[in-house]
Design a protein with these regions (language model features):
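Conserved Radical SAM active-site core
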Residues: 1-139, 149-150, 162, 166
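Auxiliary Fe-S-binding modules of radical SAM enzymes
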Residues: 1-13, 19-20, 193-275
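Structural preference for beta-strand elements that scaffold enzyme active sites
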Residues: 82-84, 115-117, 139-141, 178-180, ...
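Active-site beta-loop-alpha junctions enriched in small/polar residues
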Residues: 88-90, 121-123, 143-147, 184-186, ...
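Short, electropositive alpha-helical surface patch
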Residues: 99-102, 137-144, 191-208
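Surface-exposed amphipathic alpha-helices with a cationic face
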Residues: 107-110, 133, 169-175, 259, ...
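Active-site glycine- and acidic-residue-rich loops that bind
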Residues: 118, 123, 187-196
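Conserved strand-turn element in the central/C-terminal portion of the radical SAM core barrel
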Residues: 158, 171-191, 246
Length: 275
């Protein structure tokens, strides 16, 4: 059966729109959807939100259709702060084209001119460039895990291609919207090839910074990763087992090497996320 026909899409009502964020640089989190159909094997959102539903993660999405109304009220009441859009979901996954929850939330934010930071691995963010560009304080982050689209298809089967994301970065630059790159999680044996060319393009389109993130083996991640590795790259299983049970020196060196490649490409601000 085609995945498009297996996806369960539901509408739900949220109790609140904004939650306090513990992420650096963010005051609030806004997640227009629950679940995500990008089906990234390394996703740790199910563990973060303590998901225990019957549906397989990646096969369902719930649209929080009342979020824009709730948000309009909360923006009037809460202290002003930076809103991180898409901290445990992708705000521009395919469901957004039908529901436009993210877009309608942006419309409310624009009225109050609150600062935002969007994170996505979808090129569909470019459809809202007209709205985003009207905000005085904004930033958009695009996620990458590899320069190789074949490897991307293994790990992120239903996300935008590498070339589509690069075009999105270029479109953001052309619109004058500050953009950064979230490179991660770093996947041993899969992340290294072609990075010089990838980072050179990112420097060319003036990304503000690159954040290099580590692979976090939250509950459920290894269970999704292992079958893919066993089928495609069984030689890499020991490296992932090592990361699963700690942070070995060679993995830390890999993170440092990737950060160094980004700096050598001309990106001045490069940070490796802490464990």
């Amino acid at each position: 059966m085609d995945k498009e026909h297996r996806i369960k899409v539901r509408e739900i009502s949220a109790r609140t729109a904004l939650s306090r964020s513990r992420l650096s640089g963010l005051d609030y989190a806004l997640n227009p959807y629950r679940g995500c159909i990008h089906a990234c094997l390394y996703c740790y959102s199910p563990a973060v939100i303590h998901y225990d539903g019957a549906d397989k993660w990646g096969d369902f999405v719930e649209a929080r259709t009342n979020l824009p109304v709730l948000l309009a009220h909360e923006l009037r009441k809460l202290p002003r702060g930076v809103i991180g859009i898409g901290t445990v979901t992708d705000p521009y996954q395919p469901a957004e084209r039908g529901y436009r929850v993210t877009r309608h939330c942006l419309e409310q934010i624009l009225r109050r001119q609150w600062p935002i930071c969007i994170q996505t691995k979808s090129a569909a963010v470019t459809e809202d460039i007209g709205l985003i560009s009207q905000l005085r304080e904004k930033e958009v982050g695009i996620t990458f895990t590899t320069a190789d689209d074949t490897l991307r298809a293994w790990m992120e089967p239903d996300a935008s291609t590498v070339s589509e994301r690069l075009k999105a970065l270029e479109a953001l630059k052309d619109a004058g919207i500050p953009a950064f790159v979230f490179f991660g999680p770093v996947l041993p044996g899969l992340a290294e090839e072609g990075l010089e060319r990838l980072f050179a393009f990112m420097a060319q389109v003036s990304v503000t910074r690159v954040l290099v993130d580590r692979l976090r083996m939250h509950p459920g991640v290894w269970e999704r990763l292992r079958p893919c590795l066993a089928a495609n790259r069984p030689d890499l299983l020991p490296a992932y087992e090592a990361v699963r049970f700690g942070s070995p020196e060679d993995y830390e060196q890999l993170l440092a090497d990737i950060a160094d490649k980004a700096r050598r490409a001309g990106i001045s601000s490069v940070v490796v996320e802490r464990p």
